[in-house]
Amino acid sequence: MVNGPAELRRKLVIVGDGACGKTCLLIVFSKGTFPEVYVPTVFENYVADVEVDGRKVELALWDTAGQEDYDRLRPLSYPDSNVILICFSVDSPDSLDNVLEKWISEVLHFCQGVPIILVGCKSDLRDDPHTIEALRQQQQQPVSTSEGQQVAQRIGAADYLECSAKTGRGVREVFEAATRASLRVKEKKEKKKKCVVL
């Protein structure tokens, strides 16, 4: 990915509903393989080197549990974050609703001033006939790009991106956008606005 040692270090925390695609996104980006078996995460850390705009950055990737059982444990991952990815799954409109109903308030509580990237995961399922039919039976449909963009605007996200960890489409762009957002904030405010757990 990057030649030579990274000049800068940044911490990225990824949150969102359980099974929305967070861990697959991190593993595909950091290790280049797609995990075929779903194992709920408690806490996992990965490291990846990213080069954006000629700058080498070591990105510490903090994976978190989306399940409610971990609501009291998850805030331990927020301190010193430089950028937050809030994820939802394109095949789960409920997971997008939860961005507004749960995730944004948690992130803003613990990470005031930290840039947020909204990420629509599993974008390959938007056109998948089985997914479309399963959602139709529940009077739902896959989340559209414009719906994702509207939520990103409502929560004040620095960016909105979609990706498919399964096909690899858009994965690198998510982390490049996140890295850029973390660098912009640092340049604007060297006071280092970081997450605080109260």
Curated annotation (Swiss-Prot):
It is found in: Cell membrane. GTP binds at residues 16-23, 63-67, 121-124. A motif (Effector region) lies at residues 38-46. The modification Cysteine methyl ester is found at C195. One of its GO terms (biological process) is negative regulation of phenotypic switching. GO terms for molecular function: GTP binding; GTPase activity; protein kinase binding. GO terms for cellular component: cytosol; extracellular vesicle; hyphal tip; plasma membrane. The keyword Zinc-finger does not apply. Residues 196-198 form a propeptide. Keywords: Cell membrane, GTP-binding, Lipoprotein, Membrane, Methylation, Nucleotide-binding, Prenylation. Its main location: membrane. It is a lipid-anchor. InterPro entries: P-loop_NTPase, Small_GTP-bd, Small_GTPase, Small_GTPase_Rho. A lipid is attached at C195 (S-geranylgeranyl cysteine). NCBIfam families: small_GTP. Belongs to the small GTPase superfamily. Rho family. PANTHER family: RHO FAMILY GTPASE. This is GTP-binding protein RHO1. It comes from Candida albicans (strain SC5314 / ATCC MYA-2876) (Yeast).
